[in-house]
Amino acid sequence: MILKNTELGRLHESGVYDSFTFEQTTRLCARLLDMFNKAGVAVIRMGLHASRDVEQEMVGGVYHPALREIAESILYLEKMNAVCEDGGKYVFYTDKRNISKIIGQGGANRNALSQRGISFKIKEEKGTDLRAE
């Protein structure tokens, strides 16, 4: 995120600096989150908490109140892509806290798999990250 009255803000406004797109940002966050998780480093917070003041001071870059959820959703899509064959029908088992991430923001993961002819149902299984049948 790029804020007014900062050095980065001035560079952005003068055209010297251009920020990442939303997709670049969310994919980078997903990669970093995955890297930290694999290293056993707990990521406590990702992004900024929702604030009208921050939004008013923003002149560029990416701000989304659900940045972490989107990053986690990208990682779930990658896991599902790794186990799914085109045209297949699957049941994914997961803890209830993961269901919205598996479906994706606005159904993004469901839509992405649907484009490959993949359909799936989700069943709750306490303590399970993701398991496919």
Say what each PLM segment does.
Residues 1-88:
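C-terminal scaffold of the Radical SAM
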Residues 52-133:
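Radical SAM enzyme core and accessory elements
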